[in-house]
Amino acid sequence: MEVLNNYQRQKIDESNDEDFYSSPKFVYHLDANFRTYLSSVYKNEIKDNSTVVDLMSSWDSYLPLEKKYKQVIGHGLNKDELEKNKILDSFWNQNFNLNQKIPLDSSSIDYCLMVAAFQYLQYPEDLTRDIARILSDKGKIIISFSNRAFWHKAPNIWTSSTEEERLTYVRKVLISNGFEEPRIIRKFNDISFNFLPFLKNDPFYCLIATKE
């Protein structure tokens, strides 16, 4: 089911995303606390010997190395970044804002991961429906994000929303396009340390939803 209107899909920079991501960015876009907590979520949620796809990935997937995976497949826009991601068994390049059809077999994936990625989707409904298609019975999607973004590349739905509104938006896309009610995780820094703004941790938001 469609959730966004045409205005909400628009973004400041409508140029091809492939041009923006043509140069590799070997930096962390999320702080160490966020990355560590995300890895702990993956450790608890992902069963051993599962097939995992990391959509809109980069040079690090934050997957715990001590777990056993049947296969880890990566996707993104920059070949150099994905080649450096050593946990990936394979990967492919594709612009999801131009083509939302995932080149994977139906029911072939146990877990789909999206880290700091959903905020760039202009057609999240179509992609979410196809994610549901590739997931196995009771397969899960794990979407995580913070309050950071390349704002000129994020559609209006994201840039004009509060952090709570973004959670509501992602939830609506999920439950309208093949997923059960998601479990939502929020993690913030201790307010007692907020007197030094530059020491604030990135807020952690995560939605975990099971395929209907």
Regions flagged by a language model, labelled:
Residues 125-140:
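A short glycine-rich, Lys/Arg-flanked "PGG" loop and its adjoining helix->strand segment in the class I
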Residues 44-102:
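Class I SAM-dependent methyltransferase SAM/SAH-binding core
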Residues 37, 161-186:
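Short alpha-helix
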Residues 99-112:
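A short acidic, Gly/Pro-enriched loop at the edge of an enzyme's catalytic core
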Residues 1-47:
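Class I SAM-dependent methyltransferase Rossmann-like catalytic core
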Residues 141-171:
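Conserved class I S-adenosyl-L-methionine
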Residues 178, 192-212:
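Core SAM-dependent methyltransferase catalytic element
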Residues 110-125:
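A short SAM/SAH-binding and catalytic strip from SAM-dependent methyltransferases
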